[in-house]
């Protein structure tokens, strides 16, 4: 930008808020954030200030920093402060204050208070102009909120900062920009991103940043960085430095008072997010990584309040680090606590890649505690990482700090477990050996090393007891006081001495270790015996490095050799050496094998009387030492042969075989010293004082031997086992120090010593008690181990008391809800508990034994007031509750055992269970305890017990005194749980077949309960229980020989039927079907139907229509499940029950009353009904049966009708008997119906019942296939047999049924020939005969309807009905129907039926019926005319419909012969007001489709003109007429249209006069109706014109013009305006349709139009609507002019002046039409000559010389504006001519004229001109 331009811009910015005129000032002042511009323009500063201070006060409450603005921006003096009058310094300070306020108000833009405050800055200080940039920056995070639009709106477009130019479009549209636009702006303009980043940096520094701003920056920055992921170079050069600068500011530790904790958190999380994204896109250098890490960890809150985000960002940051894995200074002080470890574990589970970050922290913090804690998170499968860690361990192995050495040991052990080979390889590469490292770390790293190596005792000879290196050690502090290290009393001293020994050895050469140890032993220990116990224990301690242990063994050998003086016997060491031979290390075993050989060798050379070495050190003060004799000890040594010793070296388990198979079973001649050897060895092993290193192997050896069961375990029973719980913690500590896996090894072995086969019951009881204690021990490991031992040894406990203790303990653990590591219930279910044990356990928890049993005769549960009172007492209640819990668990276990079909079931168990059932009822009722689950489990146990008993082959005998069905019934009734009830019902069902005599006496209560409760349950279990109970109890009753089984069934079904409303709907059918199949269809279906009928009758009586319908639906679904024969049999039996209902009221006490009363299916309710009640019941039951038969979908495969058809149609011989059975049952039902009709028509007249019987009879006959049906009704239809009203009614019903059956069922295309012949030969003649005789009106109607149905059905298929014989019969029948027996009858019903019959015949025979045409159509039309005077509108409607159907039939079949009556037919159809329009429309469509269209058009026009159909009062009828006319025109040929053109034009003129006709008749139709009809008129006319050519249409159009102008050919007296309106409406539509084709037709209109326009301008004619339509017509003509029609001079002259003259007095409402017409005209005739004329014509109407009105000027100005818009530069040449007049208009007195010119015309001209018009105007 040039210097001059920049100066001008600066001046412009400074003076942007300076307004030199009132309008500009008003405009500036009207810009507001909260007010409408018009409202804002009127407000003064005092009002605005008042509102602003309210907002400021609210903001001050939220943030005290706003208070400082009260004395500056919002001081009272600011009201009168005009920034345009201030000095430069004042303005500078003002801008700083405004900027400070805007940055501070950013977080509160969503509040109304902030807008009120900022409003003051905008209105008073014009911040929207001078501080626009900052306003947008602070509001930008709210770009999706309306407040952002408000901010943009108040900033003038010219003052919008250039960097925000991309917002112009959104500002203009007042829309919020989408997020994509914001991102696009950042993406495309780095300077904008840099600008915003620097603004954010200032916000951070000034502590004014807020959450929305951070979210906005983060979302856009992340997306921006991602978009440059493929252009790293550009990203690195431009964006990354900017982003890193901002991120660094965010990471700086913030001052607490300046920021809230939430903003501090947001800053940190924002920076973390950006760093994470950057690190994934851009590979940072090591320096940047370190710098960012330092920045992150510099804040002390990073690993406190933001642990997880900090760890995530650090892991993401270092994830792609490719440099060397070395110490990072930033990580040196990295502190890892439990919280951080927990977070790391969480991140690891969430699959974060932590490996690089963790290994760097590990290396940087090594070898501190932090490094060891990180080891689980390091991927040791990475070879590089593995080697680095190994080398670090080696480098730090010489440390003297115990804590560091401990960490190094743990790390090294982890490495060896992870990859032993790689660990070994790495050590070798660094010239290290495992033994050396173990010595340095003074701990064992590899448990089994080089098992193939052999123990080398060669260096023993070179060992000395005094070497130089040891002399540097101060032994005065290490003097031992222990008497023996075989005693745990001296464990602490042993550990201290051992630690010092390892320290000495680690500093010495490995080759000198034996000498060092010997010297150490000599210096530290007072006696060689104590020294030997120390060395022995060191050699057996796994925590000691292997090399030291081997050296210790060598030292022991040297010491023994030195002590072997021929008088010392060392055989007491043999048991300890045997323990050592069980060691896991082969080298250790090999060393002790050498030691054993040495002892044996010394023993064999000894003489008698030798002293026992280490006796006191081993046994201490123990008196009973169990030594073998010297002779036996020598024999023992001989048993330990060289082969045995070698075996133990190779396989330590061989020790067990040598002990138990060789030594303990040894025989020496006749003596058996083996038992002494056993005592000797086990006495020593079981010494309580021995340390864990010895005990562990002893326990393990005996435990393994005890797997097969051995009494040797009892050596440990009184000592180790009995004291285990008290000494366990001590042993755990010892094992930990000694390096023994206590929980997985030692404790398992101890528990393995307990249990197994035992010869002593006392010991078994002791062991079971010990296991019980172990099961409830707080230690989870001991619990699990003891639980496993119980599962292993439970069956080996012979005493039932021992097993019962264990069972009870496990149940107690369950009851007490103790937290244990195993599942006691799973254990109990897995244990093999036999029946006796169950009986013992259940007996021990039975409740109520203290309450005496009542006598058998009473058969009631134990319950009394005293027991209730007793249960109230808390102590008893608590005891009962505990027993209940225990009982419940035992029952669950029993249920599990019974399900597994273990040998548990038995009658004695069932007896106990029954006793428990009584007790539970007592607890539930009297104690109010929750017994439902226990009862349910008990019921399951009882059920399973009975089922298992039934499946066994043994004979079962029950004690009827203890196993009683009444107890079960009582429990069923008392229990509120459906599950308990159902299971007990199943118990009864199983008992019924196993022991029917037990339950037979309780059948009635059982059935009553099932009916009252079980059937109501909505679950599969209840349904199954119910069905099983019925299925098993009823057969048991029958097989037991009880006579009144039927009564039982009736009682059962009556109970169920009573509960029917409460049975879930979806279960009803399944329930009753299963009952029926269980009880037998013949014995139960009719009962169910009858009982359901009573339910139906009861619901009908109570007006419960929904319930009665649901009964019918149920029975319908129920019947589907049975065959046709079964269903019919059930209905027959139902009718018999119906017949048992008495006709008259019964006398109470009579025999008939008693019989009925005693039957459950009738009961007292029916027996006591009065006569009227009985009549209602009979009718309702039949109605029920009738509805059931009629409600089904008879075409379903499962319907009775289909099933009957399948039986009756099947011709196979095997089905003959079934067919006869079905027909016999059907005849029985129809006979019942006819007999009942006779009874209740004659003997006991009941009209309502007879009506139901007729319906029932019809539905019954409807079930038959057609051929059977026809044969069954023909005789009843013969009029000769109709002797009384009953037979007539039967015949009528049969005829109606036949009609319905033929209509719905007959498919002639697939009809059987037998049916067709039966219809033609039997049914039709009978019907025609009946029609001819006309016996009864209703019967006549039925016969005619049936006749028409048959003819329609069979005639449509073209079968035998097309034959001449049948045709002849039909023609004869047509002759009968057209007489007074049909068409000429007086009854509407008969007339309608006869018309249907005629229609059916005409449909088939067509032209063959022409001879009877005069007897049909004219009478039909007369019948139609008679409907207008008929009082019964419904009959009239039916008659009209029937006539229309008849006419449509004739139109289709013989259309040519309908021409003569076409006008009458059309008038009939169009005037049938009672018939729906769509029906009449379809009939009219038939006329259009089937008849000559020219004739149809002619008839339609004649109906309108001559019949004056337009006078019809129904606009719908006229619409129907027009629709038909339109359809006719659309379908007819052009030739046909031309022939009828004159007549059609007459119709069209009449149609155009329709509006006048309506107005003349008191506005017969409303305006909308008229418009709708006129639209149809125009549609018909245009469609017709389309059929004509120019030659044929022009004269017609001329006639139409003459009618419009002069009224020539008018049929009504119409005024000029009305005609012209009608014509021009039509003509305008015609122009829109034909466009330029019809432009030339305007010649017929030119003069009349010109004359009309002149009359309008002169004011002699006032018709605004007509004027508007003419202008629209002219506009269309100008627009569609393609042949310069209007450019012809004469036409131009004719229309130009009249058209422009309309400007003089045009109405405001239609001015726009004139402007459009003139501008279109100018565009159409554009030429220099015509334009000049038009300009001068238009000047007349804007010039003051002609005294034009303001309205004239305004419309002229608008016209000129539109012309310039359309013509553009073509009219610029006339600008000099127009300028004076424009200038004149700009100074017009009328302000509206001035504004119209200034805002409209001048702006348009300037746009076209491209420069201001001021130069021309001046």
UniProtKB/Swiss-Prot annotation:
Transmembrane regions listed in the UniProt entry: 568-588
Keywords of the record: Membrane, Nucleus, Ribonucleoprotein, Ribosome biogenesis, rRNA processing, Transmembrane, Transmembrane helix
Keyword rRNA processing attached: yes
Membrane topology per record: Single-pass membrane protein
InterPro entries: ARM-like, ARM-type_fold, BP28_C_dom, HEAT_type_2, HEAT_Utp10/HEAT1, U3snoRNP10_N, UTP10
Gene3D superfamilies: Leucine-rich Repeat Variant
Subcellular location: Nucleus, Nucleolus; Membrane
GO CC terms of this entry: 90S preribosome; membrane; preribosome, small subunit precursor; rDNA heterochromatin; small-subunit processome; t-UTP complex
GO molecular function: snoRNA binding; U3 snoRNA binding
UniProt superkingdom: Eukaryota
Pfam families referenced in this protein's UniProt entry, alphabetically: BP28CT, HEAT_HEATR1, U3snoRNP10
Main location: nucleus
BP GO terms, sorted: endonucleolytic cleavage in 5'-ETS of tricistronic rRNA transcript (SSU-rRNA, 5.8S rRNA, LSU-rRNA); endonucleolytic cleavage in ITS1 to separate SSU-rRNA from 5.8S rRNA and LSU-rRNA from tricistronic rRNA transcript (SSU-rRNA, 5.8S rRNA, LSU-rRNA); endonucleolytic cleavage to generate mature 5'-end of SSU-rRNA from (SSU-rRNA, 5.8S rRNA, LSU-rRNA); maturation of SSU-rRNA from tricistronic rRNA transcript (SSU-rRNA, 5.8S rRNA, LSU-rRNA); positive regulation of transcription by RNA polymerase I
Cited PROSITE patterns: HEAT_REPEAT (PS50077)
Disulfide bonds: none
Purpose of the protein: Involved in nucleolar processing of pre-18S ribosomal RNA. Involved in ribosome biosynthesis.
Quaternary state and interactors: Component of the ribosomal small subunit (SSU) processome.
Family statement drawn from the similarity comment of this UniProt entry: Belongs to the HEATR1/UTP10 family.
Protein name per UniProt: U3 small nucleolar RNA-associated protein 10
Upper classification of the organism: Eukaryota, Fungi, Dikarya, Ascomycota, Saccharomycotina
Gene name in the database record: UTP10
